[in-house]
Swiss-Prot record:
Protein name in UniProt: tRNA 2-selenouridine synthase
Keywords in alphabetical order: Selenium, Transferase
Species whose genome carries this gene: Escherichia coli O81 (strain ED1a)
Enzyme class: transferase
Catalytic activity: 5-methylaminomethyl-2-thiouridine(34) in tRNA + selenophosphate + (2E)-geranyl diphosphate + H2O + H(+) = 5-methylaminomethyl-2-selenouridine(34) in tRNA + (2E)-thiogeraniol + phosphate + diphosphate; 5-methylaminomethyl-2-thiouridine(34) in tRNA + (2E)-geranyl diphosphate = 5-methylaminomethyl-S-(2E)-geranyl-thiouridine(34) in tRNA + diphosphate; 5-methylaminomethyl-S-(2E)-geranyl-thiouridine(34) in tRNA + selenophosphate + H(+) = 5-methylaminomethyl-2-(Se-phospho)selenouridine(34) in tRNA + (2E)-thiogeraniol; 5-methylaminomethyl-2-(Se-phospho)selenouridine(34) in tRNA + H2O = 5-methylaminomethyl-2-selenouridine(34) in tRNA + phosphate
Length: 364
């Protein structure tokens, strides 16, 4: 039964998106997991907790005996069947537990008895996690070009189209503003960092990478924060600023935040509940900056938002949203971004419209 246990092996697993059957308890998996991992636990949360208490009170032999007692009979067979199905579906995958200890070895042995030989990660999730952290530290040392610009400048799309671009907002499942949440919940901090490391490793492995192209982000992207090693390098990076006409930005924002989000919510929840979720999403975003807008201005814009939603519901038109979006950009988002950009003006090396910045980036 083959085992993977070298640094290069760990990196190769992440680069190849190797399917990982993670047999840790769900609570451990939620706290941090690798990108291509699926959670098929040997023990559920309650079983793991009981075994842990037994280990502290009576030692390892008693804990092991309790574990075998809890995962026996029909429960054991159901879990073997689930692992077996996952192995057959992912013939080039690998088993993983916390440290490559008893849990993954037990599952490996039970699978062997069921006719399947399947490798495991020697060192487990902990070893993969350390590999991810170290890879990010190393890869962050390459030069970085940041793509800046006001809200609606198409920065994310520009980054996505570069072979050396890494979409930080996509990995974080958040677009970085008060209206930035998506229908996908954000991952734990550790899982986000693991996703980032894997993406950087894959991007670096598939080309002769000289520099990174990233969006000019703040430290926080929703509830996730950038690893300090990368954030520190980004503060030293050069910046290319997209300066598109205001009307073009409005078109992008209409497409992204009104048309697409409405479509996504109704696709996920159905027409009626999807509409309610969409309305709540927009109101929540505006409410998040109530204090900065001031109560009077917030109430004015919230009333315009309600009117725009009524128009959209009855006619399908999103044009009414301009009545609150335009002042929100002119009075809040644009001044805020310009103020932030002024503080790092010496790092700006290029300005232009979207296509011009894209061409400039390709030439670097």
């Amino acid at each position: 039964m083959q085992e993977r246990h070298t640094e290069q092996d760990y990196r190769a697993l992440l680069i190849a998106d190797t399917p990982i059957i993670d047999v840790r308890a769900p609570i451990e998996f939620e706290q941090g997991a690798m990108p291509a991992a699926i959670n098929l636990p040997l023990m559920n949360n309650d079983e793991r907790a009981a075994v842990g208490i037994c280990y502290k009170q009576q030692g390892s032999d008693a804990a092991l005996a309790l574990g075998h007692k809890l995962v026996a009979g029909e429960i054991r067979q159901q879990r073997i069947d689930a692992w077996r199905a996952a192995c057959l579906q992912n013939p080039h995958g690998i088993l993983c537990c916390a440290r490559g200890g008893q849990r993954s070895h037990i599952v490996q042995r039970w699978l062997h008895d069921a006719g399947i030989d399947y490798p495991l990660v020697e060192g487990g999730y902990k070893a993969l996690r350390q590999t991810a952290i170290q890879a990010t530290i190393e890869l962050a040392q390459k030069p970085i070009v940041l793509i800046g610009g006001c809200t609606g400048s198409g920065k994310t799309l520009l980054v996505q189209q570069q072979p050396n671009g890494v979409d930080l907002e996509g990995l974080a499942r958040h677009r970085g503003s008060a209206f930035g949440r998506t229908l996908q919940p954000q991952l734990s901090q550790a899982s986000f960092e693991n996703m980032l490391a894997a993406e950087m490793l894959k991007t670096d492995a598939h080309q002769d990478l000289r520099l990174w192209v990233l969006e000019d982000e703040s430290r926080m992207i929703g509830s996730n924060h950038l690893p300090e090693c990368l954030r520190e390098r980004m503060t030293q990076a050069t910046i290319a600023v997209v300066e598109d006409p205001f009307e073009i930005r409005l078109e992008r924002l209409n497409e992204e935040y009104f048309l697409r989000m409405h479509h996504d919510f109704t696709h996920a929840y159905g027409d009626e509940q999807g509409w309610q979720e969409y309305c709540e999403y927009l109101h929540h975003g505006l409410s998040a900056i109530k204090r900065r807008l001031g109560l009077q201005r917030y109430n004015e814009l919230a009333a315009r938002l309600d009117a725009a939603l009524t128009t959209q519901l009855t006619t399908g038109s999103t044009d009414g949203h301009l009545a609150w979006l335009v002042p929100l950009l002119e009075e809040y988002y644009d001044p805020m971004y310009r103020y932030q950009l002024e503080k790092k003006a010496e790092k700006v090396v290029f300005r232009g419209e979207w296509a011009e910045v894209a061409e400039w980036v390709k030439a670097q």
